[in-house]
């Protein structure tokens, strides 16, 4: 099926052109608009347990929406909540996706939870990650712009700036020169990738943005005013 990326890189959206027999699955709440000829069905992809793992561990919604155009053709437009870009991948091999990055895909793409272990729990990667496998179109959403990095040897990325990476890469979450420099420098944990493959990074960091917003939140005492 054909697609268009609109509003990139600041406020990205994907417009998918469906014909009879095409199906695209998307995060709950991602639909911006669609033609009258397009139909939407909501389901728990992979059953209750897999949906629960994908939601709790991967930061994605419990339900997925599937869009079809059974009576001909139609368009559906999909976008995420945060400002940023949309990355299209023609999936040819498994990719690991960080928490909250999945936007949509062909139904031929299998997206399931992949536990990150203690490395994932104590890092900006989140408690778990998602693994996309199979073949077809995959759409990821970022916070900020997207940069593609070809790794041949080693490459280090702040965990909050990781969007996705090829599953063939080995990785290890660690500090930058020990805990003291990490605490004093204001830098978080980093992910050291090893091998050959592609890493996709995002130019903004969601945890850092949340920390920046925190002083502007209304305090509980404001409720009494």
Predicted regions and their residues:
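Composition-driven recognition of glycine/serine/threonine/acidic- and proline-rich low-complexity segments
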Residues: 1-225
């Amino acid at each position: 099926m054909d697609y268009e990326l609109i509003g990139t890189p600041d406020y990205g959206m994907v417009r998918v052109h469906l014909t009879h027999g095409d199906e695209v699955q998307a995060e709950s709440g991602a639909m911006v608009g669609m033609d009258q000829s397009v139909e939407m069905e909501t389901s728990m992809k992979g059953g209750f347990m897999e949906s629960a793992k994908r939601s709790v561990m991967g930061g994605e919604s419990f339900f997925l929406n599937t869009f079809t155009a059974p009576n001909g053709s139609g368009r559906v437009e999909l976008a995420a909540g945060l400002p940023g870009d949309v990355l299209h991948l023609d999936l040819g091999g498994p990719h690991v996706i960080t928490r909250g990055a999945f936007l949509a895909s062909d139904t031929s793409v299998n997206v399931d939870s992949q536990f990150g272990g203690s490395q994932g729990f104590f890092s900006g990667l989140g408690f778990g990650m998602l693994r996309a496998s199979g073949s077809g179109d995959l759409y990821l959403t970022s916070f900020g712009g997207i940069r593609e990095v070809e790794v041949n040897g080693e490459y280090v990325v702040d965990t909050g700036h990781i969007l996705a990476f090829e599953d063939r890469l080995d990785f290890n979450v660690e500090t930058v020169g020990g805990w003291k420099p990490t605490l004093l420098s204001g830098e978080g944990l980093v992910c050291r990738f090893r091998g050959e493959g592609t890493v996709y990074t995002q130019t903004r960091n969601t945890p850092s943005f949340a920390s920046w917003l925190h002083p502007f939140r209304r305090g509980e005492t404001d409720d009494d005013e």
